[in-house]
Amino acid sequence: MTYPNLLDRFLTYVKVNTRSDEHSTTTPSTQSQVDFATNVLIPEMKRVGLQNVYYLPNGFAIGTLPANDPSLTRKIGFISHMDTADFNAEGVNPQVIENYDGGVIELGNSGFKLDPADFKSLEKYPGQTLITTDGTTLLGADDKSGIAEIMTAIEYLTAHPEIKHCEIRVGFGPDEEIGVGANKFDAEDFDVDFAYTVDGGPLGELQYETFSAAGAELHFQGRNVHPGTAKGQMVNALQLAIDFHNQLPENDRPELTEGYQGFYHLMDVTGSVEEARASYIIRDFEKDAFEARKASMQSIADKMNAELGSYRVTLNLTDQYYNMKEVIEKDMTPITIAKAVMEDLGITPIIEPIRGGTDGSKISFMGIPTPNIFAGGENMHGRFEYVSLQTMERAVDTIIGIVAYKG
């Protein structure tokens, strides 16, 4: 189905810079997200028909569409995030390519282009309307496509009371891209049986498995002396960092793994001979493998300290989120419903693990099973990001189908 306000709504949203900041100590991490929620989203939530609309100190804008059929007793939530990834988001100037011809798309005057030879996903979209960047920013389809789709579904249901639906709760939240947005999510206030994050990629994505994730911060304490008289005295902290890294499995890196394979990912190294720091992220799907990865890093640190004869390697491990499959597989109702709705719409469900996490990873462990459904974005987090309007329309269809489902 086509929705006349969907495209303009999306274009309005992406032009607002809501980039999050991992170094911030506030919630949300940037004032622009507060402004977007209070000045743009909340007024529109009220206009499209949501009731009891409010903004929480945790950065979430919340609203409710009451059920219009007493036989539909479920309460279902839909959640999308306001922030965009760590890439230029100032001055987003989307291009709308109608009836895409399957060829190369020049991204404004930037010199960058979307070429099917480089981005095979384009082969799915001839004849469709694509929204791209101008090559100087990201687009923000992750996850403003999700926000636009949820808002459009509510607007349509309000205008069509003949479509009977259950109670719907909507939540638009901050800071998903920096991994802290759902930390303060109020599951008791949201009060639904289950929810969906509308934060996936291409048509048909339906996901209930994520990585389990941890961060590792390492400090290496060296001893700097003049290199000319260094023998037997110098301890080079940078060399310690190299030695630590070289003891990790060389093939367990993001660029060499896929599917259900986990990894260690070196994110940052800074320092000097005297002192160095390294940051890693650790990812795996199975709980035992995840715990083993953390234990392996600790073992390497302990071994190095023993060999050095002093405590020069310090490791701090922090769990970030866990594989939501552990929660959702106890009751697969949200997956069963979404799968049935997609199939009724002629959409082939793509049920694969997410090699990442969503807000649903944390919310599921707060007591609300929250799988993820497609929002349409491709090549997210950079200048080559784009989305199909037709896929966004199908996401709206899917949301409407889920809340009207009678099975």
Curated annotation (Swiss-Prot):
Zn(2+) 2 binds at D142, E177, H381. It comes from the Bacteria. InterPro entries: ArgE/DapE_CS, Bact_exopeptidase_dim_dom, Peptidase_M20, Peptidase_M20_dimer, Peptidase_M20B. Its cofactor is Zn(2+). It catalyses: Release of the N-terminal residue from a tripeptide. Cleaves the N-terminal amino acid of tripeptides. This is Peptidase T.
